[in-house]
Amino acid sequence: MSARRDLVLAAAAILLAAVLIAAWGHQAGRPPVKMITPTLTNRLELCLTCHDGIEEISASHPVAAFGCTTCHGGDGLALDADLAHAGMYGGPNPADLAVVEVACGGVNCHSGDPATGRDHIQRVNRSIQATYAGAIAQVRHAFGEQPDLTAHQGTHAVQDDQVVVSPDAVPSLTAFAPSATDPQPVQQFSANCLNCHPWAQPAAKPYFYRSTGCATCHALYDNDGLYKGSDPTISRTEPGHASAHRLTTAIPYTQCNHCHNRGNYNLPRMVFVERTDLPALSAVKTEDATARRLAEYYQPIGQFTRCEWELDCVDCHTAREAMGDGDIYSSQADAQYIQCRTCHGTLTEPPKLAAITDLNDVAVHQAQVNGKYALQVGDQVVVTERGEKLGQVRWSADQLVQTMKATGQTYNVPLVQGSACQQKPDEQASRYCHACHDRELKAP
């Protein structure tokens, strides 16, 4: 009975498509109709008629399998733009956190089993980036709204029924929504200082352009916010678009900079003060790459180790640091655990290594999705204090080698053991390494 019903529905869809195509073809200047039938849905789609040339979103989301409406929603049989786009999830961005469960969820997609790393949506919603709970707790505590720095509120309400990773985690947050009776600085903080998290819309200006939700990090934007791809329907002159219709885990530091390192907060006034020393956009092609990176990345008087300005942020910060590990934290310090010693070891201990024993290992899947490095059974890779395998840092020929996730470039990782380093056993946090290993941009 079910098979017969499916045949009837398929025949009806084909008949409807034929009618639409005939009507479309009678209008002058229309592009030829382009039809696909994605294997995951087995439903005809006409979206590529207008969006012919658009980039495939990623190798793990092939259009032949997913099509367009699986992720975007909308009406895949409509050839009128307004009708086709009606009912789309999140408008142009199905990765927005308000709709991501509908667009990207499902046990086989991004809201599945934590054991297989498929619980991306749950983890992101609880992450310190999404909740902004640390900053909110600091401000509320400073102005007498709560007795300590334990987080009680976030940008949105979130619940964790089972704290599994860290004893520093909290079980839930309520939504931060100051009223007219709250201290004025708390109200100003709410109005002026909550636009740098994945729920918030970015400032529509150069250097700040980005998307929201998962696409905040995974959809790359140029500093000018202009589209450089091949979809004829997307403007090349209107800022506010990703550089291409793609998602990636090969994320360069420039993407992180759309939120981070764009200025500082004026705490007495509770306003964001933008940097005035950023290079002009026109200097991108003409300025020495190293000089530009130092100028754009570092604020004056900041100390940074050599690796921090040669590598990208994702080469040190793991997915579970940035996207969350499933627990709800009160501060960034509670969520962050990668230190210099993770890869470089100490005077008394080398970095911890673990073997890849199964091709279904999460680390192998991460390597396949990234595409800049590969893993096989038997490889020895660095493992964090929380048991997370860093597949891009691998033991090879008596040497620890790191592969950059954004470019594929490799570096030999020097170990503290056997070096001239004079670190103290009780001073292992990265800030102590910075005291000697720094590249400082002097104030003008």
Segment roles from a protein language model:
Residues 68-70, 76:
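Active-site-surrounding "flap" and adjacent substrate/cofactor-binding loops of secreted or lumenal enzymes
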Residues 2-42, 48-55, 93-103, 107-431, ...:
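Extended surface/linker regions that mediate inter-domain or inter-protein docking
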Residues 79-95:
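N-terminal juxtadomain amphipathic helix
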